[in-house]
Amino acid sequence: MIPLLSAEQLRQADANTMAHEPIASIDLMERAATACANKLMETLACDVPVAVLVGMGNNGGDGVAMARILNMAGQPVRIIVPRYKPQGSPDFEANLGRARKDRIPVDFLEEGAELPAFTRGTLVIDALFGTGLQRPVTGWLKELVMALNQRPDPVLSIDLPSGLFVEVNAANDPEAIVQADRTFTLELPKLALLLAENARYAGEWEVVPIGLDREFIASLKTDAVVLEAADVAALMPVRNRYAHKGDFGHAWLLAGGEGKMGAALLAAKACLRSGAGLLTVHVPAGQDGVVHATLPEAMVSLDEDGTALAGLPKFEKVSAIGVGPGIGKADGTARMLKLLIQQAPAPLVIDADAINILAENKTWLAFLPEGTILTPHPKEFDRLAGKAANDHDRLMKAKELAVRLKAVV
């Protein structure tokens, strides 16, 4: 699992690495810049001009150091510094001095100045602001960001697109955030990069390791983590070479209705693909033919109703039950769902129309067995938990709902 740190925790991780490695802050900056420059040069043609737009803090220092490294590799590079305060951070100023000694062109923009024109095909590296930003970009700097976003030049952001906050962006100004084509985020993913509404800012992003103290990072308490394939693989039991289908559980799927058997088939295929040894699909009477023809490995149970599910099957040797895809919201189907969650003989996975039924009958949520899995898409979730103002708000509502229901959402 990869922890998703807050801005303050990211600062602590930097400070801890510097104190305990030990390494000076300017040397850690050099390490980060080298890692980003090397990653960029894996795909960047040697004749592509690069313009590095830097702020006067440590994210800007990363950008200046990166410009120096690219220059040493023979890349045509220039540095652009919007001078929004008299003095930059010590590490920024030190790197700027080194860049001048290397005779890298440096353009200072005084307040009110426009973004200079770039040679056609220039790659712009955005190193204005990093994870320490705590308020929206305003005034002249916002105008520069807006001008950059209107340019056709490709943009690579370092750590985060300038203007984007690490976690919550509800109070941010969407016009004051750089819209990058690509983002190199340092050491760890950031929560903001994982929210769909921020995709237009980050573009394609990837993590660039810079050697922070992972033991310290693992000791921090975080509200969110990213699951990796290895985390899931560790939960999968090793299959005995002499095992057979009866050793891997019997799943039941209550799905489908008149005109919606495709949903049942897709869910059934996914269930078998996930590793269930046996699968019985409960469908309306007369709808079994398509299941037999498409999934001969699945067994079929027939409901008494011919258009929608209206009753519970006689469950036999059931390990888990999925319900919802394509079932509709008829009164009889709703009654069936209520009985199921009240009498469930096995763990439940609730999806699609079953979630929509619960959204219209929220008092039934009290009947959900502990450990139930709910799999709504955003619209279904909003019906169930209330309309979310943004993706982060939806994430917080999902957390609250999961805790309240003792469920997985």
Identify the function of each model-found stretch.
Residues 1-82, 89, 182, 188, ...:
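Small-residue (G/A/S/T)-rich helix-start motifs and N-terminal tracts that mark the onset
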Residues 65-149, 289-301, 309-317:
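N-terminal small/polar loop signature for handling phosphorylated ligands or for N-terminal nucleophile
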Residues 91, 136-137, 169-170, 385-389:
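Short, solvent-exposed loop/turn segments at secondary-structure boundaries
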Residues 96, 141-145, 180, 337, ...:
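Amphipathic alpha-helical segments in well-structured domains
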Residues 105, 165, 392-394:
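Generic hydrophobic, helix-prone segments enriched in Leu/Val/Ile
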Residues 121-123, 128-222:
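Internal gly/pro-rich beta-alpha loop/helix module
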